[in-house]
Each structure stands twice: as structure tokens, then as C-alpha cells.
From Swiss-Prot:
Free-text function comment from the UniProt entry: Myoactive peptide. Increases the amplitude and frequency of spontaneous contractions and tonus of hindgut muscle.
Protein name: Tachykinin-related peptide 3
Superkingdom to which the source organism belongs: Eukaryota
Secreted keyword on record: yes
Secreted as UniProt keyword: yes
Any one of the GO BP annotations: neuropeptide signaling pathway
Major localization class: secreted
Keywords assigned by UniProt, alphabetized: Amidation, Neuropeptide, Secreted
Modified residues (Arginine amide): R19
Gene Ontology cellular-component terms listed: extracellular region
Coiled-coil features, chain-numbered ranges: none
Source organism per UniProt: Rhyparobia maderae (Madeira cockroach)
Tissue: Midgut.
Amino acid sequence: NGERAPGSKKAPSGFLGTR
């Protein structure tokens, strides 16, 4: 989760990419 999510742009991969 969070590899290419909208949250992963700022946070590292898998940090808060679920949002």
C-alpha cells in the first residue's frame, strides 16, 4: 500500500499511501 498512491508522493512508499 502506498507505492503509487496520492499520499506516497510526499510520504515514503507505504507510509500513508492509503489515503
